[in-house]
Amino acid sequence: MTARKKPKVYITRKLPDAVETRMRELFDATLNIDDTPRSPEELKEAVKHADVLVPTVTDRIDSELIEAAGPQLKLIASFSNGVDNIDVAAAHARGITVTNTPNVL
Protein backbone atom coordinates (compact mmCIF):
# COMPACT_ATOMS: atom_id res chain seq x y z
CA MET A 1 0.00 0.00 0.00
CA THR A 2 1.32 3.43 -0.92
CA ALA A 3 1.27 6.24 1.61
CA ARG A 4 -0.93 9.13 0.59
CA LYS A 5 0.99 12.34 0.00
CA LYS A 6 0.24 15.24 2.28
CA PRO A 7 -1.11 18.33 0.49
CA LYS A 8 1.47 21.10 -0.02
CA VAL A 9 0.39 24.19 1.91
CA TYR A 10 2.13 27.55 1.57
CA ILE A 11 1.56 29.91 4.52
CA THR A 12 2.49 33.50 3.73
CA ARG A 13 2.93 34.92 7.25
CA LYS A 14 3.66 33.79 10.81
CA LEU A 15 0.56 32.24 12.39
CA PRO A 16 -0.09 31.35 16.04
CA ASP A 17 2.24 28.57 17.22
CA ALA A 18 -0.61 26.10 17.79
CA VAL A 19 -1.84 26.64 14.22
CA GLU A 20 1.63 26.17 12.73
CA THR A 21 2.20 23.02 14.79
CA ARG A 22 -1.06 21.51 13.55
CA MET A 23 -0.29 22.55 9.96
CA ARG A 24 3.05 20.71 10.13
CA GLU A 25 1.32 17.59 11.45
CA LEU A 26 -1.35 17.47 8.76
CA PHE A 27 0.33 18.95 5.70
CA ASP A 28 3.59 19.40 3.84
CA ALA A 29 3.61 22.99 5.11
CA THR A 30 5.95 25.79 4.12
CA LEU A 31 5.91 28.31 6.95
CA ASN A 32 7.05 31.93 7.09
CA ILE A 33 9.05 31.66 10.31
CA ASP A 34 10.56 35.16 10.15
CA ASP A 35 7.19 36.77 9.26
CA THR A 36 8.73 38.84 6.48
CA PRO A 37 6.18 39.85 3.84
CA ARG A 38 6.77 37.90 0.64
CA SER A 39 7.15 39.77 -2.62
CA PRO A 40 4.71 39.19 -5.48
CA GLU A 41 7.48 37.27 -7.28
CA GLU A 42 8.03 34.98 -4.27
CA LEU A 43 4.30 34.33 -3.98
CA LYS A 44 4.04 33.55 -7.71
CA GLU A 45 6.81 30.98 -7.37
CA ALA A 46 5.16 29.46 -4.28
CA VAL A 47 1.73 29.01 -5.89
CA LYS A 48 3.28 27.08 -8.77
CA HIS A 49 3.78 24.16 -6.38
CA ALA A 50 1.14 24.59 -3.66
CA ASP A 51 -2.14 22.71 -3.31
CA VAL A 52 -3.33 25.27 -0.76
CA LEU A 53 -2.38 28.91 -0.21
CA VAL A 54 -2.90 30.41 3.25
CA PRO A 55 -2.52 34.20 2.97
CA THR A 56 -3.41 36.88 5.49
CA VAL A 57 -5.20 40.18 4.96
CA THR A 58 -1.84 41.86 4.22
CA ASP A 59 -1.27 39.71 1.12
CA ARG A 60 -2.71 40.85 -2.20
CA ILE A 61 -3.93 37.80 -4.09
CA ASP A 62 -4.79 39.28 -7.47
CA SER A 63 -5.64 37.73 -10.83
CA GLU A 64 -1.99 37.81 -11.93
CA LEU A 65 -0.94 35.76 -8.91
CA ILE A 66 -3.84 33.35 -9.39
CA GLU A 67 -2.94 32.87 -13.07
CA ALA A 68 0.63 31.98 -12.01
CA ALA A 69 -0.68 29.11 -9.88
CA GLY A 70 -0.16 25.54 -10.90
CA PRO A 71 -3.21 23.42 -11.77
CA GLN A 72 -3.00 21.67 -8.39
CA LEU A 73 -3.91 24.84 -6.43
CA LYS A 74 -7.46 24.14 -5.26
CA LEU A 75 -7.88 26.28 -2.15
CA ILE A 76 -7.03 29.76 -0.93
CA ALA A 77 -7.78 29.73 2.80
CA SER A 78 -7.28 33.26 4.09
CA PHE A 79 -6.32 33.59 7.76
CA SER A 80 -8.50 36.69 8.11
CA ASN A 81 -12.07 37.83 8.68
CA GLY A 82 -12.68 38.62 5.03
CA VAL A 83 -11.46 38.08 1.49
CA ASP A 84 -11.28 41.66 0.19
CA ASN A 85 -7.59 41.14 -0.60
CA ILE A 86 -8.35 38.19 -2.91
CA ASP A 87 -9.67 38.31 -6.47
CA VAL A 88 -12.41 35.78 -5.77
CA ALA A 89 -13.77 35.89 -9.34
CA ALA A 90 -10.35 35.03 -10.79
CA ALA A 91 -9.97 32.18 -8.30
CA HIS A 92 -13.42 30.78 -9.07
CA ALA A 93 -12.70 31.01 -12.81
CA ARG A 94 -9.76 28.64 -12.20
CA GLY A 95 -11.83 26.29 -10.03
CA ILE A 96 -10.11 27.45 -6.84
CA THR A 97 -12.20 27.63 -3.68
CA VAL A 98 -11.73 30.72 -1.48
CA THR A 99 -12.42 30.63 2.26
CA ASN A 100 -11.63 32.71 5.29
CA THR A 101 -11.57 32.30 9.06
CA PRO A 102 -14.37 34.41 10.56
CA ASN A 103 -13.77 35.74 14.08
CA VAL A 104 -10.08 34.81 13.96
CA LEU A 105 -8.92 38.28 14.98
Where are the regions a protein language model picked out?
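N-terminal glycine-/charge-rich "phosphate-binding" loop or analogous flexible N-terminal tail
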Residues: 1-52
